[in-house]
Amino acid sequence: MDAGHVNVILGEAEDKGLRGSINLVGGAKISFDFNGIGIETSFNTNTKNRTLMIGSGSTVVFTRKYIDCSSIQYIEVFERTK
């Protein structure tokens, strides 16, 4: 997937406080939640080398994952319903 598209999709999800998952080639999934209670989630895309850094955690432990955007098959975003 193009890093620019990844940036737009995750940027919109972050703005709206949504959750979802990044589905990688081979079946692996990385979940995210931009409105998790007690959890901070952030991301950064680098369009030059086509990578995505996504991280989440608390003030004690913050985990980062670095992903080659070409290995992203699709991104699912879930709307919050009441």
Located regions from the model:
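Intrinsically disordered, low-complexity repeat segments enriched in small/polar residues
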Residues: 10-12, 42-44, 75-78
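Structured surface patches comprising rigid loops and adjacent beta-strands/short helices at the edges
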Residues: 35-39, 64-80
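Acidic, low-complexity, intrinsically disordered interaction modules
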Residues: 24-64
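Short glycine-rich, low-complexity segments
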Residues: 1-29, 82
